[in-house]
UniProtKB/Swiss-Prot annotation:
<keyword id="KW-0007">Acetylation</keyword>
<comment type="function">
    <text>Accessory subunit of the mitochondrial membrane respiratory chain NADH dehydrogenase (Complex I), that is believed not to be involved in catalysis. Complex I functions in the transfer of electrons from NADH to the respiratory chain. The immediate electron acceptor for the enzyme is believed to be ubiquinone.</text>
</comment>
<dbReference type="GO" id="GO:0005743">
    <property type="term" value="C:mitochondrial inner membrane"/>
</dbReference>
<keyword id="KW-0496">Mitochondrion</keyword>
<comment type="similarity">
    <text>Belongs to the complex I NDUFA3 subunit family.</text>
</comment>
<dbReference type="InterPro" id="IPR026626">
    <property type="entry name" value="NDUFA3"/>
</dbReference>
<dbReference type="GO" id="GO:0045271">
    <property type="term" value="C:respiratory chain complex I"/>
</dbReference>
<feature type="region of interest" description="Disordered">
    <location>
        <begin position="56"/>
        <end position="84"/>
    </location>
</feature>
<comment type="subunit">
    <text>Complex I is composed of 45 different subunits.</text>
</comment>
<keyword id="KW-1133">Transmembrane helix</keyword>
<keyword id="KW-0679">Respiratory chain</keyword>
<keyword id="KW-0813">Transport</keyword>
<dbReference type="Pfam" id="PF14987">
    <property type="entry name" value="NADHdh_A3"/>
</dbReference>
<keyword id="KW-0472">Membrane</keyword>
<feature type="transmembrane region" description="Helical">
    <location>
        <begin position="19"/>
        <end position="39"/>
    </location>
</feature>
<keyword id="KW-0999">Mitochondrion inner membrane</keyword>
<keyword id="KW-0249">Electron transport</keyword>
């Protein structure tokens, strides 16, 4: 089986080296990002980033879930990112 795969790869490399290189680059692009040390931090940043940002609204005094100011800190802290 390995001999057949090796023969196929050798034959393909002889006929179409550009396709082989493009498939290798594409395969590495899929495989390598999870192995990167930055992958962990990008996941942590994406979890801490809010999907919706506060919009200034007129407070009539009957909105307990609205922050008093749009820039009030809410959600998970990013202090771990500042300490890197």
């Amino acid at each position: 089986m390995a001999a057949r795969v090796g023969a196929f790869l050798r034959n393909t490399w002889d006929k179409e080296p550009v396709l082989v290189v493009s498939f290798v680059i594409g395969g590495l692009a899929v495989i390598l990002p999870p192995l990167s040390p930055y992958f962990k931090y990008s996941i942590m940043i994406n979890k801490a980033t809010p999907y919706n940002y506060p919009v200034p609204v007129r407070d009539d005094g009957n909105m307990p879930d609205m922050p008093s100011h749009p820039q009030d800190p809410q959600g998970p802290s990013l202090e771990w990112l500042k300490k890197l």
